[in-house]
Amino acid sequence: MKIGIIGAINQETERLKKIIHFYIEKKINTYKIYIGKFKSHDVFLIKSGIGKVSASVATMILIDLYKPDTIINSGSAGSLQSFLKIGDIIIPKKTCYYDVDLTNFGYTRGQIPGYPKEFTVNEKICNFFKKNADKYQLKYIKGLILSGDTFVRENESIKILKKQFPSAIAVEMESSAIAQVCYKFNIPLIIIKSISDESDNNATVNFKENIDFVSYQLSKFVKIILENLIDM
């Protein structure tokens, strides 16, 4: 199986590199790609950079050059719910943009014309972790994760997002863009996130303090996914 993995920043990809065997590094423009193996899987890890456009380009590079059977988006996220704490791992079932608004044309908030109102992720992976939530100490696997080109860092912003998207559990800057490209090319997507901050007035400080730990947590769960992907 060919698996693409997308991480946005150095801390995330450096940890993920450690679980790939015999990798070589390739560079496409400013994008670094690490090509290697995990057991029988061919793995293609790319550092996308931050934000929706960068993530979309990285996803397209993976699809165009390596034609992965599945793509995994691994990264940090800010919590939007009090029951999610720093370090918790979440595997959301769906994602959408919070900074898209064409409601005046009859679309749902967050919906791009020609696309569903929310992008869904690989159902098998959700079912696997639902069955094994206690075993892997997963805090929460259902719900919606939001994406937009802002690092959410204010209490007032949380109130607005929760009002507009009541089912949202977390927010970040890449997953919906990756999901849109995967949807277009019919590539199954797995999203795995770890909470780095609570999206509040302390979010910037908390993110800086926790990103290394969060990246370590993520690498452990990506490894679990790779070990079980065929059975899923």
Curated annotation (Swiss-Prot):
- Which residues act catalytically here? E12 (proton acceptor), D197 (proton donor)
- Which residues bind substrate per the record? G78, V152, M173, E174
Catalytic activity line of the entry: S-adenosyl-L-homocysteine + H2O = S-(5-deoxy-D-ribos-5-yl)-L-homocysteine + adenine; S-methyl-5'-thioadenosine + H2O = 5-(methylsulfanyl)-D-ribose + adenine; 5'-deoxyadenosine + H2O = 5-deoxy-D-ribose + adenine
GO BP terms: namely:
L-methionine salvage from methylthioadenosine; L-methionine salvage from S-adenosylmethionine; purine deoxyribonucleoside catabolic process
| Pathway in which this enzyme or protein is active | Amino-acid biosynthesis; L-methionine biosynthesis via salvage pathway; S-methyl-5-thio-alpha-D-ribose 1-phosphate from S-methyl-5'-thioadenosine (hydrolase route): step 1/2
Extract the GO molecular function terms from the UniProt entry.
adenosylhomocysteine nucleosidase activity; methylthioadenosine nucleosidase activity
Which keywords accompany this UniProt record? Amino-acid biosynthesis, Hydrolase, Methionine biosynthesis
Name the HAMAP family for this protein: Salvage_MtnN
Q: What does this protein do?
A: Catalyzes the irreversible cleavage of the glycosidic bond in both 5'-methylthioadenosine (MTA) and S-adenosylhomocysteine (SAH/AdoHcy) to adenine and the corresponding thioribose, 5'-methylthioribose and S-ribosylhomocysteine, respectively. Also cleaves 5'-deoxyadenosine, a toxic by-product of radical S-adenosylmethionine (SAM) enzymes, into 5-deoxyribose and adenine. Thus, is required for in vivo function of the radical SAM enzymes biotin synthase and lipoic acid synthase, that are inhibited by 5'-deoxyadenosine accumulation.
Q: Which family does it belong to?
A: Belongs to the PNP/UDP phosphorylase family. MtnN subfamily.
Q: What does the subunit comment say? A: Homodimer.
How is this protein named in the record? 5'-methylthioadenosine/S-adenosylhomocysteine nucleosidase
Q: Which organism is it from?
A: Buchnera aphidicola subsp. Acyrthosiphon pisum (strain APS)
